[in-house]
Amino acid sequence: MKPLRLAFAGTPDFAAASLQAVLDNGHQVVAVLTQPDRAAGRGKKLQQSPVKQLAHSQGITVLQPENLKGEAIHQQLRDLNLDALVVVAYGLIIPQAVLDMPRLGCLNVHGSLLPRWRGAAPIQRAITAGDTETGNTIMQMEAGLDTGPMLLSESLPIGDSETGGELHDRLAAQGARLLVTVLQDLEKYLANATPQPDEGITYAHKLSKAEARLDFRLPTGALYNRIRAFNPFPVSWVPLNGQPMRIWRASESPQPAQANDEPGYILSVDDQGIHVATGDGSLILEELQLPGKRRMAVSDLLRGNPTLFSVGEPLGDAIINESGDHSGNA
């Protein structure tokens, strides 16, 4: 198949992997759409998205509309005379008028095995749910949220200790590879597209920092999965003196729960880490980040602060009362 005339819409690192793969395989990317530069970091300086940085390095025209609703951006896209628009983690709604513009429509790389985990955060939701596998789906876009016909999918096992960041990187590479495969014979894949099944639909709602606050009344496995899933964003935490203490890494303890163990209280502190009671056992916290400090292994942290955590005391302000309110603020 001859090289396609494409535009690419994407924003984060996950999307940049796909853009690089498309460029490496000789397709003509005539424009890149990415979200406007956003203020980020402590200095709140404007940051270019990874996709914009890659596009600039390749001399590709970059478009950064606040949305895709206006006639001006519609005319710009019509003038590109596209064979297809590739959309990967763009972050803006694609209206029907834009979906209808390219000759062969719009394609999307989605980091799950659809219809499971439609939506914004499929990678993290798969881990929090305790899924043992996930994958990527290349689909033809339509107006619904990740509802379009599937062109190609491939599964990927989730490691027992894999973090959201680690799984993200493996899925980004897999998605890029599958995208290139589809683009090599796009019309054949479109002709053989498969509707998504009506069974097994779940939604991967957007992540928030508030939900990353740990409730130690949950089972150990659920807490462990949350800590893995939310590394490196939004990062699990509990309040310590009114500020978030981040929990980067933990492991499940084999010790069963004791009748008098109160969730959120420290059971022991040793070379493994801080053993904290949960709803059905205990969790070993192995890497923490105190407010305003860098992340550290608990063993290193305790060398400089041996009395920071005391057995029989709650972990920071981690206790939640029976009404569901937290005893501390963040």
Swiss-Prot record:
Q: Does the keyword Secreted apply?
A: no
Q: Which GO terms describe its molecular function?
A: methionyl-tRNA formyltransferase activity
For this UniProt record, give its keywords in alphabetical order, as a comma-separated list.
Protein biosynthesis, Transferase
Q: What is its EC number?
A: 2.1.2.9
The UniProt similarity line reads: Belongs to the Fmt family.
**Which Gene3D superfamilies does the entry link to?**
Formyl transferase, C-terminal domain (3.10.25.10), Formyl transferase, N-terminal domain (3.40.50.170)
**First-level EC class:** transferase
Question: By its UniProt entry, which NCBIfam families does this protein fall under?
Answer: fmt
| Protein's recorded name | Methionyl-tRNA formyltransferase
What organism is listed for this UniProt entry?
Alcanivorax borkumensis (strain ATCC 700651 / DSM 11573 / NCIMB 13689 / SK2)
**Top-level taxon:** Bacteria
